[in-house]
């Protein structure tokens, strides 16, 4: 009931759910359908993902907690986004509010660090997204600008790519490329103490594109 009220609230752009169990699947589905009609994303963090967590949720709520995989499948079916960490519930709300949902599952990942980029690629792939390598046209365009990248699913600019001018050009080209539906830019430790090398280019380029862009 509270969730449905928030969906109808004109001052609410995104609805966040902290779930222990789902007591009324029909009401949840109706709420999700109405939120979709109004263009309001719903994001959920669910307790009871492990077997012991399921038992704790049951004892705390007094309700039967369905199999975790079944709940996850139900949430996906009705269009409710799910996060795996509580902190991500807050972080994802900002992204969902500012950017429209992409129409596809193809995600390009660019990074200045192989380790950090690999971590993001793993998480996206586990979420069922397609991590796409740059196509020949993108590789050629960047090559003509003196920036060499390979056909790897992770566009790893390495330490050399922490130059602001290089990062800006690559981000602009990737956002403008039709080979992906969304982009994740990974700011690695190589730019941790020099925000101008990677963070500044992201802030400058992001407003110029309608393509969904997330930063890790």
Briefly describe each language-model feature range.
Residues 1-216:
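Catalytic-core regions of core metabolic enzymes
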């Amino acid at each position: 009931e509270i969730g449905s009220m928030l969906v109808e609230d004109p001052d609410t752009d995104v609805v966040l759910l902290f779930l222990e169990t789902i007591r009324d699947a029909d009401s949840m589905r109706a709420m999700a359908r109405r939120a979709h009609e109004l263009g309001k994303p719903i994001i959920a963090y669910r307790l009871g993902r492990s077997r012991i967590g399921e038992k704790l949720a049951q004892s705390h709520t007094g309700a039967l907690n369905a199999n975790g995989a079944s709940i996850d499948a139900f949430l996906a079916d009705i269009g409710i986004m799910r996060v795996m960490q509580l902190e991500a519930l807050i972080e994802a709300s900002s992204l969902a509010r500012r950017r429209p949902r992409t129409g596809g599952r193809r995600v390009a990942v660019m990074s200045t660090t192989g380790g950090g980029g690999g971590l993001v690629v793993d998480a996206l792939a586990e979420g069922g997204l397609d991590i796409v390598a740059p196509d020949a046209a993108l590789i050629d365009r960047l090559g003509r600008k003196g920036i060499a990248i390979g056909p790897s699913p992770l566009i790893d600019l390495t330490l050399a790519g922490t130059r602001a001018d290089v990062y800006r050009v690559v981000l602009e080209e990737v956002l403008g490329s039709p080979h992906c539906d969304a982009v994740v830019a990974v700011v690695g430790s190589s730019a941790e103490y020099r925000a101008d090398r990677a963070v500044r280019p992201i802030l400058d380029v992001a407003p110029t594109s309608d393509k969904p862009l997330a930063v890790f």
